Amino acid sequence: MKKLLVFLRDYKKESVLAPLFKLLEASFELFVPLVMAKIIDVGIGTGDNSYVLKMCGVLILLAFIGLTCAITAQYFAAKAAVGFATKLRHALFEHIQKLSFDELDRVGTSTLITRMTSDINQVQSGVNMVLRLFLRSPFIVFGAMVMAFTIDVKAALIFVVTIPALSVVVFGIMYVSIPLFKKVQSGLDEVLSLTRENLEGSRGIRAFRKEQEETAQFEQKNGLLTGMQLHVGKISALMNPLTYIIINFAIVALIWQGGLRVNVGAITQGEVVALVNYMSQILVELVKLANLIVTVNKSVACGNRIAQVLEMESSMEDGTLEIGENFSEQEMQGKKSVVSFEDVAMCYQAVSYTHLRAHETSQDL
């Protein structure tokens, strides 16, 4: 997958600006709970309606700036991802044209089509999401923890316990699911290859009455693919419930601890609401991070499959004789161009034979 990053070389500016604007959006988002705390403690607590309206205007301003940054970041991320996929698709298509029939048959036409279409689309989605969320989500998670410490240290210790527990769940599921996604893609290639063979050879299958055998073989391959997809889907599906359980327990503990701190006058009610909002922000970002991890897992698996084709060397070699270098145009005038084969040996995988004798030309084939 790392070898494919060379196709992002022409989009360095977009690859930097997209995460930068996402970080700006996240920074403004982290100030929202503090503004809410001021509205509750100062505006509502003292009955100052003008202060409430003024701070509501601040919230609208923060939302507008955040929206502008998000749209700008999405533009740069989409431009980089689409440009990356376009260059990768062109490079892959050009490389496939250089492969001999031996390599094409060894890899398989169906899997090449899959890598040209769905695999590249999956990698494009992965690049887009990485540029938008790879820095934003961790920034908000740890930024929310830092902002919680600025409010109250004892209550913020709940964040210190919650974030590592969530990290274990998220990265543990990622560690298990990455190899399974690779197996799913391999199973998809087998099903596509079998489907293509059945469609191209449908007349032969009917002529030899092999419909039942081919149907049974397809059901077997499709069943294996379905089983692998269900297995990896069940593992990935554990992400949301486990993270929600941890976050909800953390919110309960936060409200309980916050209530005790309010009774002793250490913090205010608005600050408790701000702490809960920060915990909710962590929940939302971890859900996004979970979806990002699933997408990145698929993208890495697809990227490795594309890289395998790009690393494949062709057994064909172009000739070095060219008119104008080895032969002058004057020498070629008045002469009939004839392609001749003398003592030519041909081979195809394990089959080889010598057929053409000396002085035979392509017209004798």
Identify the residue ranges that each predicted region occupies:
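A short amphipathic helical element positioned immediately N-terminal to and/or at the very start
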Residues: 1-10, 112
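An intracellular "coupling" helix at the cytosolic face of ABC transporter transmembrane type-1 domains
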Residues: 10-13, 98-102, 118-131, 135, ...
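Helix-loop-helix
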Residues: 48-52, 147-161, 231-304, 309-310
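ABC transporter TMD-NBD coupling linker
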Residues: 200, 279-350
